[in-house]
Amino acid sequence: MLEIKSISKTFNAGTVNEKKALRGLSLTLNDGDFVTVIGGNGAGKSTLLNAISGVWPVDEGHIIIDGKDVTKLPEYRRAAFLGRVFQDPMNGTAATMGIEENLALALRRGARRTLRIGIRNSERELYRDWLKRLGLGLEDRLTSKVGLLSGGQRQALTLLMATLQRPKLLLLDEHTAALDPKTAKKVLDLTAEIVEEQHLTTLMITHNMKDAIQLGNRLIMMHEGNVIYDVAGEKKKNLTVEDLLHKFEEASGE
């Protein structure tokens, strides 16, 4: 499903501010893999997701999604088959548009543009059904501006929008980090439910090591632009936070 072959990315090359964010990183995800990604600040986690999504083209290597080499594809072309949720609840939605309008845009992502304006009643019923599963009462607020929603409501809506068309790959970049603990748990529970139900291949960055262990079927740790630890199955289930802290200490030489 996802095959990354020796990708490298350097920022400000040849200057005093040169930063090697990715160093020949290789990674393969099978169909339906739910991989949690941990690592310290500057480990290359967000750069990896930005490379996959096309925000930052890689300097070397190849990125293959569902058998197609997308290394040279621009970001807008990859958006047709990728879903992404960012850390900031303000990203991923149009604040001045209504909930139903945001859902309509997500549903039409990648489709040929037409001159037709408006949302059919049959679509509204579909949107209500989708929103009910969030348990946030948004099904009764279809015309409400998204900018008026709370951070948790907006992030849950963004997650729903990112998965409406069952993306080839779902990228979650610390998507609960800006939420309070109660809301974060609700969004994480919803994430696990949607990923399992749709059998989505998923990469989820998190700084919460407990969540990294509990969620998904596989865990990778990054350090200085590469994967230094990759664990799955029963071995992952049996991990403790102390185990991961020890791995961090080993990597940083402490």
Predicted segments with their positions:
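A short, flexible loop at the N-terminus of ABC-type nucleotide-binding domains that lies
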Residues: 1, 10-24, 74
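Conserved beta-strand-loop-alpha-helix hinge in the C-terminal portion
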Residues: 226-249
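Helix-to-loop junction immediately C-terminal to a conserved catalytic motif
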Residues: 53
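The feature captures the beta-strand-to-loop junction immediately N-terminal to the Walker
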Residues: 38-40
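ABC ATPase NBD coupling module
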Residues: 15, 19, 57, 69-83, ...
